From Swiss-Prot:
PROSITE patterns: ACONITASE_1, ACONITASE_2. Belongs to the aconitase/IPM isomerase family. LeuC type 1 subfamily. One of its GO terms (biological process) is L-leucine biosynthetic process. It comes from Variovorax paradoxus (strain S110). The gene is leuC. This is 3-isopropylmalate dehydratase large subunit.
């Protein structure tokens, strides 16, 4: 029987299935950070349990870590709760162990969904979980990856398994050559704009088509990262030579005979040609334009040359109400041109867009424009996703380009993606952000978030408002 990529990985990891479809699934890799792990470790401690398989755990601190003040060490973490979570992770890993731990201030520390792939901890065919919804990022490697809750974090630590039911299969095919000036971020925002934030609910999405194959591994990670924003629990991209080339030589990747055996298996991780999907969505990549969200949901997105929608033109009452509420929160008027929206801050970073390719993309725009950050922009910050990314960017001189233009070059971490550390928006401030969520209060109470690509964010920083990066790139 022909199987999809999702079918193959699921079948390889099912330990037992009940009559109602509930299955026990074996977990290969458990990524751990400081926010959703303290209660789980405490649960193990109270029950007198140890980690079932220490070699499955890779940990780092990211959500609460500051992006400035590293010279002060742990004293640079201003918020007491944040500091306690970071130090508690240190203590828990010291007690329980891990295959790899990248603590605060270490060279390889960074966002968990950046350090996992770059360290070789994420491998094709794996089941990967983390107490974070954007674990779907790792699906770019042909791994079945999804977020879990805190109680499930403890369950995986104790048993190396999870309970769950198999999702349906969705295929999202993006065919054609992506236009100049458009990126993986524009692809995934266009997908979400088409199917909505509930379009993938109940599905695991496989992203395929020539436009997806043409993306780098970093671009594929951006797409899979936002599968959760399309409603899916997980996103997948089939393994190809790009996948294998990216992994080779990474610190935790297999070597020698084990590498050869792994590669032979990885090359089987593709959907069979005649595999059936429960739903198929198709997009023409040649028609995709730079995307900008205008509202308080990722599905509230339009092309850069578009306009803020008019609720009076929406026939569906619930959708009309959602538009009206979003307009009030975002402080926007119907029919306003997107390129007439001025901004207060710019954030280039997050697990969606903080890898070296993203840094290069943004720096290239800044260098091309040859101008400083606009006077109306209070803060433009660039936050690499890990110490490794930061070091590589500095070797290439990207930090010099950013700083010369008036951007702040920060230390790695989740930063302004979420209001859980010192980097946040004040009420009413408007931000061009390369992150993944534009919910009310996501970047700070009353903050207004517009999701864009790194290139679009860089161009907005210099011009002070949204512009079509294709005009300048």
């Amino acid at each position: 029987m022909a199987r999809t990529l999702y079918d193959k990985i699921w079948d390889e990891h099912v330990v037992h299935t009940e009559e109602d479809g509930t299955a026990i699934l074996y977990i290969d890799r458990h990524l751990v950070h400081e926010v959703t792990s303290p209660q789980a470790f405490e649960g193990l401690r109270e029950a007198g349990r140890k980690l079932w398989r220490i070699s499955s755990v890779v940990a780092t601190a990211d959500h609460n870590t500051p992006t400035t003040g590293w010279e002060r060490g742990y004293e640079g973490i201003a918020d007491p709760t944040s500091k306690e979570q970071v130090t508690t992770l240190d203590k828990n890993i010291a007690e329980f162990g891990a295959a790899a731990f990248f603590p605060f201030l270490s060279k390889r520390q960074g966002i968990v969904h950046v350090i996992g792939p770059e360290s070789g901890a994420t491998l094709p065919g794996m089941t990967v979980v983390c107490g974070d919804s954007h674990t779907s990022t790792h699906g770019a490697f042909g791994a079945l990856a999804h977020g879990i809750g805190t109680s499930e974090v403890e369950h995986v630590m104790a048993t190396q398994t999870l309970l769950g039911k198999k999702a349906k299969n969705m295929l999202v095919k993006v065919e054609g050559k992506l236009p100049f000036g458009c990126t993986a971020k524009d692809i995934v925002l266009a997908i979400i704009g088409k199917i909505g934030t509930a379009g993938g609910t109940g599905y695991t999405i496989e992203f395929a088509g020539s436009a997806i194959r043409d993306l780098s591994m970093e671009g594929r990670m951006t797409v899979c990262n936002m599968a959760i924003e399309a409603g899916a629990r997980a996103g997948l991209v089939a393994v190809d030579e790009k996948t294998i080339g990216y992994i080779k030589g990474r610190p935790l990747a297999p070597t020698g005979v084990e590498w050869d055996q792994a590669v032979a298996y990885w090359r089987t991780l593709q959907s069979d040609p005649d595999a059936a999907f429960d739903a198929v969505v198709e997009l023409d990549a040649t028609q995709i334009q730079p995307q900008v969200t205008w509202g308080t949901s990722p599905e509230m997105v339009v092309d850069i040359n578009g306009r803020v929608p008019d609720p009076d033109k929406e026939k569906d009452a619930s959708k009309r109400s959602a538009i009206e509420r979003a307009l009030v929160y975002m402080g926007l008027e119907p029919n306003k041109a997107m390129n007439d929206i001025f901004i207060d801050k710019v954030f280039i970073g997050s697990c969606t867009n903080s890898r070296i390719e993203d840094m290069r993309e943004a720096a290239a725009v800044v260098k091309k424009l040859g101008q400083k950050v606009a006077k109306n922009v209070k803060l433009a910050m660039v936050v690499p996703g890990s110490g490794v990314v930061k070091e590589q960017a500095e070797r290439e001189g990207l930090d010099v380009i950013f700083k010369a233009a008036g951007f702040e070059w920060r230390e790695p971490g989740c930063s302004m993606c979420l209001a859980m550390n010192a980097d946040r928006l004040e009420p009413g401030e408007r931000c061009a952000s390369t992150s993944n969520r534009n919910f009310e209060g996501r970047q700070g109470a009353g903050g207004r978030t517009h999701l864009v690509s790194p290139a679009m964010a860089a161009a907005a920083a210099v011009h002070g408002h949204f512009v079509d990066v294709r005009t300048f790139a």
